[in-house]
């Protein structure tokens, strides 16, 4: 059963599709190319046991720091790195304090496009078809817009001095396998990964 089916089977919400919020990338005072490069890197992360376990699996030292202290934390070497989507790296000018942007794509951020199940189920079949078609179109257009936005953000970061590199993602995936499995078990979604 996929996430969409699980939500729709719950009877409270009806999932019409998914929107993209970009992918999260590493940025910091040094680049990372392979899992070995993460060793002892103090990286600012969200306050989450699961998030910390993933970065620890890479050998990094996950550190909690308020978002509004992130820029100065990089400048003052309180942290070595952080992670966010390209749009926020650009808007907050994090590439100035942490000029190395390594394209880890470690978190693919999505948002669900939802409607109340009662409302959806009250529609006629024809109305449901209209809603479904409109939602499919909206999701497709939004994902294309988001991709374009992220592509432009990446180019602007480069134009303003950000140093961008690709990463050996296979080494990261392998290093995080146990953390991913533990997280899936903890939140009860192991079947979605299998």
Regions found by a protein language model. Give the residues of each.
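Short, small-residue-biased leader/transition segments that mark boundaries at the very start
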Residues: 1-3
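N-terminal secretory/targeting leader peptides
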Residues: 5-194
